[in-house]
UniProtKB/Swiss-Prot annotation:
Biased composition regions of type Gly residues, renumbered to the chain: 110-135, 422-439
Organism the protein comes from: Bovine herpesvirus 1.2 (strain K22)
Extent of Polar residues compositional bias: 351-361
Protein name according to UniProt: E3 ubiquitin-protein ligase ICP0
GO biological process: protein monoubiquitination; protein polyubiquitination; symbiont-mediated disruption of host cell PML body; symbiont-mediated perturbation of host exit from mitosis; symbiont-mediated perturbation of host ubiquitin-like protein modification; symbiont-mediated suppression of host cytoplasmic pattern recognition receptor signaling pathway via inhibition of IRF3 activity
Gene (UniProt): BICP0
Comp. bias (Acidic residues): 286-303, 315-328
Enzyme nomenclature, EC number: 2.3.2.27
Zinc finger (RING-type): 13-52
Enzyme class, spelled out: transferase
Length: 676
């Protein structure tokens, strides 16, 4: 016997997923399968693998409309015209049809018994003994109905148990407990949870929390015991009761089996749905060349939509480079290998995508250029260039010539600007080179000039203020006042005002100078004592002429002969220190102990070194030096304090007279020395 011929024009078989060999069609749906595959399938499942319709017969070896072979199938209509009710139940297609009555009639209509009884009654009513015949007929009919009902119930229970056993043995989905939120452990267990809740609500009067706890317990025991009805019944006895537990467990297992079974609906063939529909689309590996058949129309459309079609691929011959023109060859020779690729694209303005809108790309000035002291950015910002490989660069404007290094160094120098310097070399060189850098400007001003702005208001105000200060003429120094002599007298009496007192008249100096040798310390002391006499005696103030005469006489006496130096010490070479009373050391030490604590206090050696080259003095230093000189003179001349050092501090040119000594003398001696 020749092997069955293949029929690739019919597509692939949904059972073996191969080309159909020995085509056979199921009646009445006319779905095509392999003859061997569909016969094995129908041995335990009298339904079509595609549409789940009951199969009446198989048609194969079709030569024409009148020449074919037919194989009857047990799943077709029986002699009484009824269909097999177990097919849809086994494969779980009637989940939404409600609970299944396992005791329903298997092959008879619900009114079959009634019709038979009515027929018997009508036949018996014709004779004289119709009543008795009708009674016998009703009794016989009732007996037959009871026997049929018991048989149908037994067959239904056996079918349900057989279905549960088949699901437990075959491949199925796992049974899972509920989640912590009292939900089903998997989506396919939702109907099991709903059935358990309905059964518990119909049996017990419980609250929502109690119902959730009981449902979780039932689902946990179902996941633990599985399809073991004895173990599950023992676990349900404390909750349901010993009498009701077996029936509850049998119904629970039947509902769970319907939800976890795996039917042939997971094997959707190529012809079950159009392209783009739901289901798994299997690839057609046949070598069919027929294009005119209707069955192949689905294959052609699926080939274009499956993503595996090679019709849109580029052939190898089409990937060769196009011949270049003479212009392109010349352009590549002049600009290099990358120039030829960029020359194929027109010079267009570059754009950047901003969520659907096309806006010109703007390239801001980088901040790194603003931080450089000598800017390198061009005066005019260049247009953005294309970042794509082989793109043409946009033309750039030529940059301004850069200033010479010497000019840049002078522009960046920190020296102050002179009159008219703002418009001079530094600003001109900086603006020409394209970077705004001034001689005293900071980072903010350089950044403002680089960005083409005048800068913030505070920067503008600081720039104007510095310019005004630099351009303002320098005032001429004021002439220093003549130094006041140390011998200027001050009225130191208790009730006298703190004002200078004139020295004694020249006539009063004669007796004092008569007994003293000119140029000796005794003569100088006599002159000083005579000058202080009017102040102590509260005399009248002499005229300025007398004061000038006394001052000149004392200076002449002190300069006629040099002051003899101590033994073993050379005479002083400084004319300022020659002939002056050397009381500066003691005065400085005493002033430091009494009224000069802190930063202005210096040792005597440092002050002595400063006397040789005093340098410029501040107003505070001059005032302090004057106070120390007057205090030293007061202690030596009036209080009789012995000298401690021969170093004397001569008056400096340009110095000025210190303040009044009333406060100083009152702080030193309390004023008691002057009232005695």
């Amino acid at each position: 016997m020749a092997p069955p011929a293949a029929a690739p024009e019919l597509g692939s078989c949904c059972i073996c997923l191969d080309a159909i060999t020995g085509a056979a069609r199921a009646l009445p749906c006319l779905h095509a399968f392999c003859l061997a595959c569909i016969r094995r399938w129908l041995e335990g499942r009298p339904t079509c693998p595609l549409c789940k319709a009951p199969v009446q017969s198989l048609i194969h070896s079709v030569a024409s409309d009148e020449c074919f072979e037919e194989i009857p199938v047990g799943g077709g209509p029986g002699a009484d015209g009824a269909l097999e009710p177990d097919a849809a139940v086994i494969w779980g297609e009637d989940y939404d049809a409600g609970p299944i009555d396992l005791t329903a009639a298997d092959g008879e209509a619900p009114g079959a018994g009634g019709e038979a009884g009515a027929a018997g009654g009508s036949e018996a009513g014709g004779g004289a003994g119709g009543a008795e015949a009708a009674g016998e007929a009703r009794g016989a009919g009732a007996g037959r109905a009871a026997g049929a009902a018991g048989g149908r119930a037994g067959r239904g229970a056996d079918a349900a148990q057989e279905f549960i056993d088949r699901v437990a043995r075959g491949p199925r989905l796992p049974l899972l407990p509920n989640t912590p939120g009292h939900g089903p452990g998997a989506p396919y267990l939702r109907r099991v949870v709903e059935w358990v809740e309905g059964a518990l609500v119909g049996t017990f009067a419980v609250t929502a929390r109690e119902l959730a706890a009981m449902t979780d317990y039932v689902m946990a025991m179902l996941a633990e015991c599985g399809f073991d009805d004895d173990g599950l019944a023992d676990a349900m006895e404390p909750l349901i009761g010993e009498d009701d537990a077996p029936a509850f467990v049998r119904s629970l297992l039947f509902v769970a089996a319907r939800c976890v079974t795996v039917g042939p609906s997971h094997l959707i063939p190529q012809q079950s749905a159009p392209p783009g529909g739901r289901g798994v689309v299997f690839l057609d590996t046949s070598d069919s060349d027929s294009e005119g058949s209707e069955d192949d129309s689905w294959s052609e459309s699926e080939e274009s939509s499956s993503g595996l079609s090679t019709s849109d691929l580029t052939a190898i011959d089409d990937t060769e480079t196009e011949p270049e023109t003479d212009a392109e060859v010349e352009s590549r020779r002049t600009r290099g290998a990358s120039g030829a690729a960029r020359a194929r694209r027109p010079a267009e303005r570059q754009y950047v995508s901003t969520r659907g809108r096309q806006t010109p790309a703007v390239q801001p000035a980088p901040r790194s250029l603003a931080r450089r002291p000598c800017g390198r950015a061009a005066a005019v910002s260049a247009p953005p260039s294309s970042r794509s490989r082989g793109g043409r660069r946009d033309p750039r404007l030529p940059a301004a010539p850069r200033a010479a290094p010497a000019a840049q160094a002078r522009a960046c120098s920190p020296e102050p600007r002179e009159e008219g310097r703002g418009a001079g070399l530094g600003v001109a060189a900086g603006e020409t080179a394209g970077w705004g850098v001034g001689s005293e400007e900071g980072r903010g001003e350089r950044r403002a000039k680089l960005l083409g702005e005048a800068g913030p208001p505070r920067v503008q105000a600081r720039r104007r203020r510095r310019t005004e200060l630099d351009r303002a003429p320098t005032p001429a120094p004021a002439p220093a006042p003549a130094p006041a002599p140390i011998s200027t007298m001050i009225d130191l009496t208790a009730n006298a005002p703190a004002r200078p007192a004139d020295p004694a008249p020249a006539a009063a100096l004669g007796p004092a100078l008569a007994g003293a040798q000119i140029g000796t310390p005794a003569a100088a002391a006599a002159v000083t004592a005579a000058a202080a006499a009017p102040s102590v005696a509260r005399g009248s103030a002499p005229s300025p002429a007398v004061t000038a005469a006394a001052t000149g006489t004392a200076a002449a006496i002190s300069t006629r002969a040099p002051t003899p130096s101590p033994a073993g010490r050379a005479p002083a070479a400084d004319p300022r220190r020659a002939g002056a009373p050397a009381l500066a050391g003691a005065a400085r030490a005493e002033a430091g102990r009494n009224g000069n604590p802190g930063r202005e206090r210096r040792p005597a050696s440092a002050m002595a070194r400063g006397d040789l080259d005093p340098g410029p003095e501040s107003s505070a230093q001059k005032r302090r030096r004057t106070e120390m000189e007057v205090a030293a003179w007061v202690r030596e001349s009036l209080l009789g304090t012995p000298r401690r050092s021969s170093a004397a501090l001569a008056p400096q040119p340009g110095g000025r007279q210190g303040p009044s000594l009333a406060g100083l003398l009152g702080r030193c001696s309390g004023g008691s020395a002057w009232r005695q």
